[in-house]
Regions:
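Short, conserved SAM-binding/catalytic segment
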Residues: 94-107
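Conserved S-adenosyl-L-methionine
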Residues: 68-80
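Signature of N6-adenine DNA methyltransferases within the class I
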Residues: 22-23, 27-36, 57-64, 78, ...
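Generic structural signal for well-ordered alpha-helical scaffold segments
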Residues: 38-43, 67, 71, 176
Length: 240
């Protein structure tokens, strides 16, 4: 299944100019990276159902990698996958790829065509979290894009923003917000969050709510996204 989705994605990438994808911070994960990210999860195979989240799902590569890993691990329960995606160019392929996953693996899926960051309430306060949808396993390759401090996404998450924020750490913070207790999140992100005043509030939020259990730094930027030029050093990180 994953190899078919990778093939479909490669065809899509070839059809969309790189500058257009760069404008939205889109960099699609290759198969080796997706499989490695999925391998970091310690799945609880005893649960009768598992809820997965892929925010900014793109063509569904990471979702497929997690599903593949679950099936290979012998999981026989129900799998519920939620994907957020708003790119009209990508959506038809995402739907097609998830239909393939449904046919081959029997998953249930939902595609939410809404802004992941502004469509739900983000508050660093449990009193505001009663209606938050929570997930067992969250995987993500968020967009790498600086936004103005006046952007609606920044205004929706003021407690983690300072100065000029980047979408990737806002996605990451919201992912932590959507994570069930003692569950796991694996993201691929730039290394820039580790230092600097712009990321201080996010780091405080991260270490208040999570523990970092795994971190992988790539030797070469070229190994992460096939055929893409990513200037920032990139890491894969797992928290719970």
């Amino acid at each position: 299944m994953l190899s078919s989705i990778i093939h479909n994605t490669d065809s899509f990438i070839a059809s969309v100019p790189k500058l257009k994808r760069k404008k939205y911070g889109q960099f699609f994960t290759n198969m080796a990276t997706a499989n490695f990210m999925a391998s970091l999860f310690c799945f609880d195979l005893t649960k009768p159902e598992l809820h997965l989240l892929d925010a900014g799902a793109g063509t569904g590569i990471l979702s497929a990698a997690v599903i593949d890993k679950l099936i290979q691990s012998g999981y026989t329960g129900r799998i519920y996958l939620t994907c957020y995606e708003t790119d009209e160019l990508v959506l038809p392929l995402l739907k097609s790829n998830l239909e393939l996953a449904k046919e081959e693996c029997g998953i249930n899926y939902e595609i939410i065509q809404d802004n992941y960051l502004t469509s739900q309430l983000f508050e660093d306060n449990p009193l505001f979290s009663d209606n938050t949808k929570l997930y067992d396993y969250i995987i993500g390759n968020p967009p790498y894009l600086k936004i103005p401090k006046e952007a609606k996404e920044a205004k929706a998450m003021p407690s983690v923003c300072y100065g000029t924020p980047n979408l990737y750490f806002l996605f990451w913070a919201m992912g932590i917000h959507n994570l069930k207790q003692d569950s796991e999140l694996v993201y691929i992100v730039p290394r820039s969050w580790t230092s600097g005043a712009y990321f201080k509030r996010f780091r405080q939020y991260l270490f208040k709510h999570c523990v970092i259990t795994d971190m992988h730094l790539f030797e070469s930027r070229d190994k992460v996204f096939d055929g893409e030029s990513v200037l920032q050093e990139t890491i894969i990180i797992k928290v719970k």
